[in-house]
Swiss-Prot record:
Residues that, per the record, bind Mg(2+) 1: 105, 239
HAMAP family linked to this entry: TrpD (MF_00211)
Domain of life: Bacteria
Protein name stated in the entry: Anthranilate phosphoribosyltransferase
Pfam families: Glycos_trans_3N (PF02885), Glycos_transf_3 (PF00591)
PANTHER family: ANTHRANILATE PHOSPHORIBOSYLTRANSFERASE
Purpose: Catalyzes the transfer of the phosphoribosyl group of 5-phosphorylribose-1-pyrophosphate (PRPP) to anthranilate to yield N-(5'-phosphoribosyl)-anthranilate (PRA).
Keyword Nucleotidyltransferase listed: no
Amino acid sequence: MAVTLGKNNMNIRQAIARVVTGADLSESEMMASMEEVMSGQASPAQIASFITALRMKGEAVEEIVGAVRVMRDKATFIDCGLGPDDILMDIVGTGGDGADTFNVSTTTSFVVAAAGVAVAKHGNRAVSSRCGSADVLEALGVDLSLDPATVARSVQEIGIGFLFAPLLHAAMKHAIVPRREMGIRTIFNILGPLTNPAGANVQLIGVFERSLTTVLAEVLLRLGERRSLVVWGEGNMDEMTVTGTSYIADAHDGRVTSYAVEPEDVGLARAAVADISGGRTPEESAQQVRAVLAGEKGARLDMVLLNAGAALLAAGRVETIVEGVVMARDVVESGAALKKLGQLVAFR
């Protein structure tokens, strides 16, 4: 249970003192502390102490919600003209899982976009693998430097756009040095997927710890998203996996439902971890993405079909993940997913 001081003007020194005792901050207290971090008022030592204390205690739902609100407020908004009934999706992982899989969420984004769901793919360079979404997209020929208006137009005109995090979260610069020097997973790994600058209202989010599935699902309910699936794959993967059990927390209709999925449950073969490994370079990773989108059979394609099936469920295009896998397979076999990649590469 969150501990509330009754005032919203807590400073970061007071917040650190609270958190090291094991007490949770309220949403407003967290917002006040994060405002100091994101505005450059907190020192590197204070930032490091604060996020380490949160990590050791375990970030509470109200703390994450408060941090998300501040980070969203500081971000550069990508206005895709989202109406009240429109769906805008993001497929993203926290990173930090150390699994070194290929670029599953990036590849999945093209399949989902080709199925007719608008995708605002939020991403960065490598965190837990040799090659992050930005690295592989750059190797594929996607221009990472497009201005916000052009990115918004990309989503509107071709149904997919890439939101390069460093260009849209300028206030994060104040936390870069402490994060880099600490070298551990912190609340900032969690915040990235929750702070899509285009305001995506449906998400498939992979997390680096199973316990975070229900926590982030509760956060997404508090933030008012339409529907989101938060997933963790057995073997410590921040995505659904065909190498073991996938655990899902489904935030929908005001509640969180948790369940598990085996690859065989959705008509996919179980695979070895080695079969879904990532490339050693961005160029090698780009070849893997192209091969999957072109329909090359194997565990990598099955990984994408599984995650795309879940994403299509979240977006309301299908009633079950099984149906989503079938739809995703049809999209890939039609050539539409590979064509969608070509459209994004060519977009200016």
